[in-house]
């Protein structure tokens, strides 16, 4: 090694952990590199790994899975309020469970609908 490299190595040996961390950050910033990519060491020789980005689902279907006989009226009221269906249509939907009651709703709204159904005594799921 050259004398210059030896001097740099000796200087690096004297750095505290905090100073070393700051140095890494500064090198990443200055040279637009990511030090965490090289941490794998031998893994890098295996070839580039394909990383698939997992998208978080934003729309959900609310499914009415099961309605106990003694909770049918309470669940029927919740289904009517969630769907806007008439009494006859909501009754048919509740009696034909498992059935989808809402489609393509936001996560918060879907979780709230599921909670309402479960609070009324039914079983619901999100898909």
Swiss-Prot record:
Keywords: Chloroplast, Plastid, Ribonucleoprotein, Ribosomal protein. Gene3D superfamilies: 3.30.1390.10, Single helix bin. It is found in: Plastid, Chloroplast. GO terms for biological process: translation. SUPFAM superfamilies: ClpS-like, Ribosomal protein L7/12, oligomerisation (N-terminal) domain. GO terms for cellular component: chloroplast; cytosolic large ribosomal subunit. Its main location: plastid. Homodimer. Part of the ribosomal stalk of the 50S ribosomal subunit. Forms a multimeric L10(L12)X complex, where L10 forms an elongated spine to which 2 to 4 L12 dimers bind in a sequential fashion. Binds GTP-bound translation factors. This is Large ribosomal subunit protein bL12c. It comes from Trieres chinensis.
């Amino acid at each position: 090694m050259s004398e210059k490299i030896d001097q740099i190595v000796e200087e690096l040996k004297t750095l505290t952990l905090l100073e070393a961390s700051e140095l890494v950050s500064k090198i990443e910033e200055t040279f637009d590199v990511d030090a965490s990519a090289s941490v794998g060491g031998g893994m890098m020789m295996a070839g580039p790994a394909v990383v698939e980005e997992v998208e978080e689902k934003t729309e959900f279907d609310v499914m009415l899975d099961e309605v106990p006989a003694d909770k049918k009226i309470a669940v029927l009221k919740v289904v009517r309020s969630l769907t806007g269906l008439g009494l006859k249509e909501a009754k048919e939907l509740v009696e034909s469970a498992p059935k989808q009651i809402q489609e393509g709703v936001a996560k918060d709204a879907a979780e709230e609908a599921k909670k309402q159904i479960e609070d009324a005594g039914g079983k619901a799921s999100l898909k």
